[in-house]
From Swiss-Prot:
Keywords noted in UniProt: Repeat, TPR repeat
InterPro entries associated with the record: TPR-like_helical_dom_sf, TPR_rpt, Ycf3/AcsC/BcsC/TPR_MFPF
TPR repeat coordinates: 12-45, 46-78, 80-112, 114-146, 147-180, 182-214, 215-248, 249-282, 284-313
Protein's UniProt name: TPR repeat-containing protein MJ1345
Keyword Cell inner membrane annotated: no
Keyword Repeat recorded: yes
Superkingdom, taxonomy of origin: Archaea
Length: 314
């Protein structure tokens, strides 16, 4: 070894080479041992963050949080450490703690768009809609063509019951990104709730064309077709939905309602009974069965079913 070489730096360099090699081979236990050796040579926030990330990969989340905190003790405004700590807290469902981390990040001058998005997401999950909207409006002021921000704003307004304002936001999101199925689904739901069934059906069918396993879109399509009296089509979509989700009592209920409307009362009763086998406390199933029994002239049985429905409603 030549004169003037700092052995400590040389040894650390070897450790880093071995560490990156272990990471590449996904040998996380070895990488962790090497990080500990590096920490013996040099304590730094970057190294603590690396250790925290390995611990998270290994599922040792509490220890990972401990090392993110060690990094932040040395460098409180370390954006990456704050972000990763906050993201871990979100994944653990610790939203209040995550909120504090991301609000701190938002106050930093260098906070970027992902930070603001995640902060708004957390606030939305916590039901702090006004605060979330303030952050989203700041994003939209700077990035008016952010489809994600328009969609987030639309979802919050939807949760607040402000359907027309929410619809405007989803329309803006879809102008920017027409392939956004989630925004299209929300648009369909809103149009349905506003009684604009034809427009809603068009949106929801587009969602289903793009993703034929979207049960939520199917549920709304079935309801709309029932409202529009297009019963045979509703029946076909119900069959498709039952293939995807054969244990959903609501689908059996829809099928029973459709069969009742088609005058197929004996078949309808079978489906209402299936609903009641899964959950005997669904009043609409008792009510639907009562209607079918009444149409079949089985008045006493119908009265009994009506009474069961009334007991649940009360």
């Amino acid at each position: 070894m030549g004169e003037g070489v700092n052995m400590e730096i040389y040894n650390e360099s070897i450790l880093w080479d071995e560490y990156f090699d272990a990471l590449e081979k996904r040998n996380y236990e070895k990488a962790l041992l090497l990080i500990d050796k590096i920490l013996e040579v040099r304590e730094s926030p970057d190294v603590y963050v690396r250790k925290a990330r390995i611990l998270r990969t290994l599922g040792e989340n509490d220890k990972a949080l401990e090392y993110f905190d060690k990094a932040l003790k040395l460098k409180p405004k370390y954006i990456l450490a704050n972000f990763l700590k906050g993201a871990l807290l979100v994944s653990l469902g610790k939203l209040e703690e995550a909120k504090e981390v991301f609000l701190k990040l938002c106050r930093l001058e260098k906070s970027d768009l992902p930070v603001k998005y995640v902060t708004a997401f957390i606030l939305k999950k916590l039901g702090e809609y006004d605060y979330a909207l303030k952050i989203i409006d700041k994003i939209l002021k700077k990035y008016p063509k952010s489809a994600i921000a328009w969609a987030e704003k639309g979802e919050i307004l939807y949760r607040e019951g402000k359907l027309k304002k929410s619809l405007e936001c989803f329309d803006n999101a879809l102008k920017i990104n027409p392939k956004d199925c989630q925004s299209l689904l929300y648009k369909g739901e809103i149009l349905f709730k506003l009684g604009r069934y034809g427009e809603a059906l068009k949106c929801l069918k587009k969602v289903f064309e793009r993703n034929n396993k979207d049960i939520r879109a199917l549920m709304y399509i079935i309801q709309i077709l029932i409202y529009l009296g297009r019963l045979n089509q509703a029946l076909e979509y119900t069959k498709k939905a039952l293939k995807l989700n054969p244990d959903d009592p609501l689908l059996y209920l829809y099928k029973g309602i459709i069969l009742n409307k088609l005058g197929k009362y004996n078949e309808a009763i079978k489906y209402f009974d299936k609903v009641l086998e899964i959950n005997p406390n669904i009043p609409d199933a008792w009510n639907g069965k009562a209607i079918a029994l009444e149409k079949l002239g089985k008045i006493n049985e119908a009265i009994e079913c009506y009474n069961r429905a009334l007991d649940i409603y009360e």
